[in-house]
Amino acid sequence: KVFKRGTVMIIYILVIAHFLADFTFQSTRLAYCKLNSNRDFLCHASIYAFILLIAIFPFVKFSRAIIPYIIIIISHSFIDWIRINVDKKFKGKQTITFISFIMDQILHVLILIVLYHAFNLGVETTELYCLIQQWPYFNNLVIYCLVFIILWDPTAVFIKKIFIYISNENN
């Protein structure tokens, strides 16, 4: 049984999954090793695919979610590949690597938002999602999780990159 109920919470859940997969479940070692190792790059892509899988399919009807899921996984890997190559080409140029980090994250989140709207991912949700949506504080919980996850890892990485950028600009 499919319930039709548009909700923006789906996009928040996808963004949570993105930040979990791109930061929390990607160790510092993996983040550095994927720059020079196809195996580590594929490991990161697999982690991302798995986290996104458990974020989208329990909540959005499979037939509506499968194409956006594939596009997200492919585009995420492609954007990461481009970023790795840009960072390699401009190794040591902190301005470029800082901008590539920012653009990487903006593009990933923008793709999630565009695909959410393009494929109307909030229109055909699952029975499980409709049941969870009835919890009195579900929306607040999702928003609090999103804020917490952004403040936990992505912000720490962003601040670290700002300090590296500033210290290199002063030298």
Task: For each feature predicted by the language model, list its residue ranges.
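Short, Lys/Arg-enriched N-terminal segments with co-localized hydrophobic residues
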Residues: 1-8
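Structural signature of hydrophobic alpha-helical transmembrane segments
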Residues: 8-17, 66-74
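Interhelical loop and helix-boundary elements at the membrane-water interface
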Residues: 23-45, 81-117, 134-171
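Generic amphipathic, hydrophobic interface segment in small proteins and small subunits
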Residues: 40-60
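Hydrophobic alpha-helical transmembrane segments in multi-pass integral membrane proteins
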Residues: 51-57, 109-125
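Transmembrane helix-loop-helix
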Residues: 55-77
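Membrane-interface helix termini and inter-helical loops of multi-pass transporters
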Residues: 123-135
